[in-house]
């Protein structure tokens, strides 16, 4: 039952984060859809870690370097997702209020992605690797 509660809370967090993103785009005072480009970063952020986790064997000496490279790439993707709305706001493509809403949505979404890997990342019977 604890897994179901975690799954429901993660989906709620994802919905709240996407709501902030859509509010930053669709409110009549902002009405610019440039911030939707951060959706690509949401999709790309877990990919390096998932690939490294599949390829790495814990007994291998290179496994630590591969995992660290995956974490470095993921960090670059996350920083880019936070930087893109700021660049858009500095270039006057979006308003600063929309930038704040998108950054709030980024925080919630990336916390949800991190929570997913913390809850379902273990190698037990309730792992995300079985999906």
Curated annotation (Swiss-Prot):
Any GO BP: negative regulation of growth hormone receptor signaling pathway
Membrane-topology descriptor: Multi-pass membrane protein
A GO cellular component entry from the record: membrane
Keywords: Membrane, Transmembrane, Transmembrane helix
Cell compartment(s), UniProt: Membrane
TM ranges: 7-27, 32-52, 69-89, 100-120
Function in brief: Negatively regulates growth hormone (GH) receptor cell surface expression in liver. May play a role in liver resistance to GH during periods of reduced nutrient availability.
Name of the protein this chain belongs to: Leptin receptor overlapping transcript-like 1
Species name: Bos taurus
């Amino acid at each position: 039952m604890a897994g179901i509660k975690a799954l429901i809370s993660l989906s709620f967090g994802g919905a709240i984060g996407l709501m902030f993103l859509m509010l930053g785009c669709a409110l009549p005072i902002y009405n610019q859809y440039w911030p939707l480009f951060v959706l690509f970063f949401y999709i790309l952020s877990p990919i390096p870690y998932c690939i490294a986790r599949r390829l790495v064997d814990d007994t291998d000496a290179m496994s630590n370097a591969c995992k660290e490279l995956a974490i470095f790439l993921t960090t670059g993707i996350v920083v880019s997702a936070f930087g893109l709305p700021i660049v858009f706001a500095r270039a006057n493509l979006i308003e600063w209020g929309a930038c704040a809403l998108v950054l709030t949505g980024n925080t919630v979404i990336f916390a949800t992605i991190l929570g997913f890997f913390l809850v379902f990342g273990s190698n037990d019977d309730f792992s995300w690797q079985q999906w």
